[in-house]
Amino acid sequence: MRLKDAIPKKGSQQRGRRVGRGISAGQGASCGKGMRGQKSRSGGSTRPGFEGGQNPLYRRLPKLKGFPMVNRKKYTIINVSKLSSLPANTEVTLASLIKVGIITTDDGPLKILGDGDLNIPLKVYAAAFTASARSKIEAAGGSCEEIGPAQAVSNEDSTKE
């Protein structure tokens, strides 16, 4: 195929509308724009976002600094200081904390934060630990084990084993 063989498809190229060339053309005098008014003038269109003079949407909404993450992980959080009320060598899971009454709501997988002191050894199973929480639990002689979010919210039967 050569460049001379590339011709446009029949009917694809139409001539532009010739306006203002007399009444016999069908687009004479006002060129199909009606009578008077802003829309009949040259350059007579409004800018994008113009709402006729009322306060536009982009000025009604506040200037937002960033936007919230759509897929943010939501955790049930608890500080190390709350775990100090448990007896020594207890297996700590989300289900056991709800059963004891330390946590009242299940907002998602368990995350241990490092605020406060801990001086009893515990076996803690959670979806996430902060670095300070992990160091405080291990310094007290306990152990930290990260489990997946699916295991963190599993039923109580699996925690009794």
From Swiss-Prot:
Top-level taxonomic group: Bacteria
Tell me the Pfam families matching this sequence: Ribosomal_L27A
The alphabetical list of record keywords is: Ribonucleoprotein, Ribosomal protein, RNA-binding, rRNA-binding
Q: Enumerate composition-biased segments (Gly residues).
A: 23-35
Entry's Gene3D superfamilies? 3.100.10.10
Example GO biological process: translation
Give the span(s) annotated as Disordered.
Answer: 1-57
List the GO cellular component terms: cytosolic large ribosomal subunit
Per its record, what are the GO molecular function terms? rRNA binding; structural constituent of ribosome
Q: What InterPro entries would the database entry show?
A: Ribosomal_uL15, Ribosomal_uL15/eL18, Ribosomal_uL15/eL18_sf, Ribosomal_uL15_bac-type, Ribosomal_uL15_CS
The chain's disulfide connectivity reads: none
What family does this chain come from, according to its entry? Answer: Belongs to the universal ribosomal protein uL15 family.
Question: How does the record describe its quaternary structure?
Answer: Part of the 50S ribosomal subunit.
Which PANTHER family does the UniProt entry name for this protein? 50S RIBOSOMAL PROTEIN L15, LARGE RIBOSOMAL SUBUNIT PROTEIN UL15M
What does this gene product do? Binds to the 23S rRNA.
The protein's name in its UniProt record = Large ribosomal subunit protein uL15
The record lists the organism as Trichodesmium erythraeum (strain IMS101)
